[in-house]
Structures are given as structure tokens and as C-alpha cells.
Amino acid sequence: MSCLACAQPSTTPFCESCAKLEYLELIRTSCHHSTSTNPVEMAQALMAHPRFPAAGQAHHPLVAGLLVAAYRNAGGDANIAEMDAAIQRANTIPGGFCAGFGADAAAIACGIAVSVIEGATVKAEHAVARSLAHTLTGQGLLLIANNHGNRCCKRSVFTVLELAAHFFTATMGVALTPPSGRVECAFSAENKLCNGADCKFYPAVPPVKAGPRLAVLG
């Protein structure tokens, strides 16, 4: 078995060192070492880390970083510095953004990934790059807007990464790996505001709560 973050041999999903990482360094470490082209699968692994919050700001850099990493792993032209830039930029979006600012940050994080990959600026020569970023963000926002009930960061992450896998394949010149079947959330028992069977990612067999997790609201 290899550590899901640093990819070094480990007897547990996360090695002793990586199990102690806070979310930002966890995301960086995993993005630097991952070879996966499946961003949903990557997100499921990292959100299962014992120190990854149940909700909140951590989900924003998760989305941006994993998309740049998956793009790079699929043969796209992206480097470690760009990966780190996407992570850092998305981490500036505060928790609770979805409720207070009129846009879900998971969707914005998708646009951040595209902007970093394309090197978008405000100049005319980057109009196409901005359009690509805005299109993915907009599509993500529309999907999230059609969700009902309590806000859920996991639901937003699954929604936009599933979308982005298809978007990147269609428009970004690389083939990301989409989920092979229906995505099932393994975190419903950790969320006191879980929408249960009303959520399209609610598992057929709901998981039993394994233990306490950081509950950062956002």
C-alpha cells in the first residue's frame, strides 16, 4: 500500500507523517505526488484524511489543486509552481462564501484552475482563456444552484469535479477520467446538515459514523 498523499510505502491510507498534515499541506503534497487523472477519486481520498474538515474553506483549494494535478497527469502543460498557485489562490476564498457572496467557491475554484493553466490575464489576447474559465465556473454554478436543502461542501465538490472531468476532456486538450459510475458520498454521517436521500450522492447504504472530525462551518 502507498500513502494517498506522498505515495511512499505505508501500512495505512496515510503514512504517519502525512496523517498529521493540515489541509493545505495535505493538498499540496498529494497534488505533487499523484499520478491520477480522476479528480473525483482524488478528492474522495483526501477528504477521508483524519484532519480534513467536514465543511469549509479547505474544499476550495482542494478543487483547484486537484484539477491542475489531474490535467498535468493527463499530459497537460502544467508545472508544480502553477499547481501551487491554483491552490493558494483558491485558498483565499473564505468559508461561507456560497451563502454570503452569491457564488459557490467550488465552482469558482474550477475557474481558477483553468485560469492558471491558461495563464489568463485581463488583456485582450487572453479573452479565450477567460471565456473558458468563466464557462466552467458558470456551468458549475448552475448545477450547484439546482441543488436543494442545506449547503454541503462535499456535494459541491463532487458536482463540479464530475463536470470538470468532462469539460477538460472536451475543451482543454487532455482526457481526464470521469467517475466510472454513480458517485456515492462516504461522508454523510459526519455532516449534521446532510440532506440524506434528497442528495444525489447519498449512498445506497449510508455509512456509520467512524469518529469525530473537524467541523468547520462554511
Regions found by a protein language model. Name each.
Residues R155-C185, C199:
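C-terminal domain-closing interface element
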Residues S2-Q8, E16-S17:
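Short, cysteine/histidine-rich loop/knuckle motifs that typically chelate Zn2+
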Residues A45-Q57, T92-G102, L143-G149:
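A short glycine/serine-rich beta->alpha loop
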Residues E118, V122-T169:
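A structural-propensity feature for long, helix-poor, extended segments
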Residues V208-G218:
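Long, compositionally biased intrinsically disordered regions
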Residues T29-G65, N150, C185:
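Polybasic, low-complexity association/targeting segments
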Residues E184, A204-A210:
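Long, Pro/Ser/Thr-rich low-complexity/intrinsically disordered regulatory tracts in eukaryotic proteins
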Residues P61-A74, I80-E82, A86-H134:
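Conserved mixed alpha/beta catalytic, RNA-binding, or beta-rich assembly cores of soluble enzyme
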